[in-house]
Amino acid sequence: MMGFVRTSSIGLSLVMFTAAASAQATPFLFSVTPPAGQPKSAAAYGYYELGYGERTFEPVAGDRLEQAIGVRATIGSSLMLLARTGVSTVGNDTRVSPRGEVLYSRSVGSSVRIAGGVGYAREYSRTDVMLARFGVGRTTSRSLINGNLMLEKPMSGERDAVDLITTIGAGRKLGSSVTLSVEAVGQDLEGFWDAAERDGGARLMAGPTIAIAPPAARWQVTVGGGPILRATRSNFASTADRPLPARNGYVLRSAVGFNW
């Protein structure tokens, strides 16, 4: 556990959501929402995640038990710094997966924001990956919806040249403290049209997420998950150190966070 804490201090994150005056936890577990921060403001949100799944895929979760810590920060109204490090077991090895992104967002009208940025990840397979993300989100007083397209460039010749990942999240506030959402994640979407896709085919995850964040409190609890489906199958498979399960799976994830 102490090793986890030490290594997690350098971690880099994937997710973030901010309110108008301070960094706030996202009601989503798998999706990124562009922030709506105030000019010249800076704030951060730290969190701890615990997840369990079988036949999972990154970035949804590590296989079996995964722990993670992270920080999500905003600087002004446009800049987002995301940091997360996860710890999971691959075979008999305990491995660390740091991820990080820098995103820049802009307003389009009164309720829509778009974002784009770049980042880096080291997967549990010990493959270095360069990231690019494009996102759009719409937030109102009672609801929010956002979508992301991620391009991942593995720095390994044993993988696809570029992996396509999408995330979609839609939430509705129930009272002042609870947000109920539906999230979906798709990985290796090139498997739908590329017969030579090398990472086992496209995989999809979809399910509910519930977030509890009392207005007067600085903490939030989020729980969610869903089934993982093999949408396509590829006759090609790389020899990279990466799990390519042949069956469907599932993932459950929880997060506890604090604003400061």
List PLM regions with ranges:
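Transmembrane beta-barrel domains of Gram-negative outer membranes and organellar outer membranes
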Residues: 23-124, 130-132, 137-147, 152, ...
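Pocket-lining segment of extracytoplasmic ligand-binding domains
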Residues: 167, 171
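Bacterial N-terminal signal peptides
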Residues: 9-19
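Active-site glycine- and acidic-residue-rich loops that bind
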Residues: 127, 156-165, 199-201
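Detector for intrinsically disordered, low-structure N-terminal pre-sequences
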Residues: 4, 14, 27-31
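Bacterial N-terminal signal peptides that target proteins for export
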Residues: 1-11
